[in-house]
Amino acid sequence: MRFFLPLTFLLLAAPWPLPACAESINGHDYVSLAGWARANGFGGYAVKGEVFVLTNKTARLLFNKDSADSVINGVNVRLSFPVAKGGFISQLDADKTLRPLLFAPKPAAKRISTICLDPGHGGKDTGYRVGRFFPRSEKTYTLALALELRQQLNQAGFNVMLTRDKDIYPELPVRPDLANRCGADLFVSLHFNAFSTGDPASVQGPETYCITPVGAASSNDAEGAGATHAVCAANRVEDKSLRLAYQMQRALVRSLGATDRSVRRARFEVLRSAQMPAILIEGGYMSHPVEGKKIFDAGYRKQMAAAMVRGILAYQKLTAPPPSKTNPASTNKVSSAKKPK
């Protein structure tokens, strides 16, 4: 099987974003988008209606007035706080969203070898169920996707472990703990969505979640609600998790032609204690009359798994360590890691 690496978003040459003057808005530090743009190599700054546009030779950023919605190089990304009044972005978003996605990361100490896949739900926990007479359970399709993804990741040269490989329910804290104890390099939790109120045809598309930064509310919380300064293990690698989430969402949307429901933040229990880059993917809406049928189709899940492999390969390319002088052509060993007992 051939995998085509999409071009990763072009990173700015500066090693670190420069500060802009901050002011307090609604109890949070904010910086002017225009000032941030000047300080960080964005020669283009324009206001088009209620949209602020920042551009340079390699990047294009869109921010909506009074909204947490942004578009970073063609991918929808939810900010931690809305853009305020005359074009101000929170300092936290400048540091924890723009910096990780636009400025080159330090090379990783080693290549990605082992990936832990977590098929959501299982056993007593069916997850979402759709269909009146012949209900379909989310747990069935997360496992089917995980098994397909494991096969494709093996073919791409990665070791893969699963938190479950049958219809059982590992408790939520157990899932990232398995990844931690096995020294996994990435943790990917697989889920599907459903829309229970209103028109089920009105919502579709994948969402990719990573851990919420300290001091911010999660993407699905009411404005300002849920903000906390508590630190969890996953916050130690939150920049890496955001980069992984971005590359995964980018690959899913582009490969599947799906609606972009954006990169989001959440303090899900399966993410909080992960000691490696960790994301949770909502692969689409089972409740949507068209997308749901695709999710139930093995051929479409195969395409989705291939897109996820592309996302992981793009992240690996972005963070790859320098080539070894003794073995510059080293690659991942192809094997399948068994779940620890």
Describe the role of every protein-language-model region.
Residues 16-125, 130-134, 152, 156, ...:
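Primary recognition of N-terminal secretory signal peptides and signal-anchoring hydrophobic helices
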